[in-house]
Amino acid sequence: RVRSEFVLRASHELRTPVTGMHMAFGLFRERAKFPAESREADLLDTVNEEMQRLMQLINDLLNFSRYQNGLQKLTLGPCDVTDLLENARGRFTELANAQDIELLVEAQSELPRLYADQVQLERVLDNLLGNALRHTANGGQIRLQARRHGERVIISVEDNGEGIAYGQQGRIFEPFVQVGRKKGGAGLGLALCKEIVQLHGGRMGVYSRPGQGTQFYMALPL
């Protein structure tokens, strides 16, 4: 509990100065006049990418700590599941096209609406789609699926990428754990997803076979 409160406070205190630094650097970058292929331009691009990663890390720490400390509240309302998936596909279409990856939406007809925080569920889907794109080879396929199962709706993101080793699957939702060969972020994304789904009264899980792909799913109550 003490550690969670410390992380929350530290993340909050870090965000303001780092945001200011990022804005100041962005202004400098706009005004700097270096040839596009120069070493200086490459260095500016590298600094910009690393500052964006730092901002993402701080935001992930802050958001995760808010959930851990019970400070995050949901803004609940009617949520159309098919629209949720279609909008998620739209946000990632450009990235998928750049990798020649097909994004499919497969939603059961006449799904009932969820009573949920749509913004938070979008955050979960964005994280899962980002992971799927990172671990799927060019020319692959990712499916966004939804179906009703009793009094729950099962939403899943399934890819035909590299899969996850069996020995890593048990810890995949723990904070600061990264799996697979391609690392990214601080390993907080899936832990945050699990917190969001649990706050909705749902549960989250994973099915994966190494070399054959991965399916992350969330089971949300109606």
Task: Go through each PLM region and give its residues.
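Primarily the dimerization/phosphotransfer
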Residues: 1-33
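Conserved catalytic submotifs in the C-terminal HATPase_c
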Residues: 75-80, 97, 102-112
